[in-house]
Amino acid sequence: MKLTPTAIYTAPDIDSPKHFHLSKNEDHSTNGKTTQISDIVIKAGGEDRDKPSDHKDTPLGNLRAELTTLQDHLNIFLTERMKLEKLKNGGGGGGGDNNKSNEQDLERRILDEGVEEEEIE
């Protein structure tokens, strides 16, 4: 019997948990669609030096690839939730709470660029 990873996302603002399952006809790879460097960096000639190695055709290697696919599904879902939340709050720049906007900008820069908080101040 082959075990397949799944994930469940819960949050106070959603009625029922969101379940993530892998489909049987889905190709799995350790090169995730949402875990690589940004398209902007790639177009500028950047190189992903942290790119993972390909998975081996072993039970653990296949699990590694399945987990990467599952992570992609979660990342896409969470990105969509963030976009909806941003629209719900007026788009992030439409005269809302400036401090919250600054915090979100700081978080984005840290996550996207690896900028340290001390460097920004």
From Swiss-Prot:
Its main location: nucleus. It is found in: Nucleus; Chromosome, Telomere. Signal peptide: none annotated. It holds the Pfam family Gon7. The keyword Ligase does not apply. Residues 1-37, 86-121 are annotated as: Disordered. Residues 15-30, 100-112 have a biased composition (Basic and acidic residues). Keywords: Activator, Chromosome, Nucleus, Telomere, Transcription, Transcription regulation, tRNA processing. Belongs to the GON7 family. Component of the EKC/KEOPS complex that is required for the formation of a threonylcarbamoyl group on adenosine at position 37 (t(6)A37) in tRNAs that read codons beginning with adenine. The complex is probably involved in the transfer of the threonylcarbamoyl moiety of threonylcarbamoyl-AMP (TC-AMP) to the N6 group of A37. GON7 likely plays a supporting role to the catalytic subunit KAE1 in the complex. The EKC/KEOPS complex also promotes both telomere uncapping and telomere elongation. The complex is required for efficient recruitment of transcriptional coactivators. This is EKC/KEOPS complex subunit GON7.
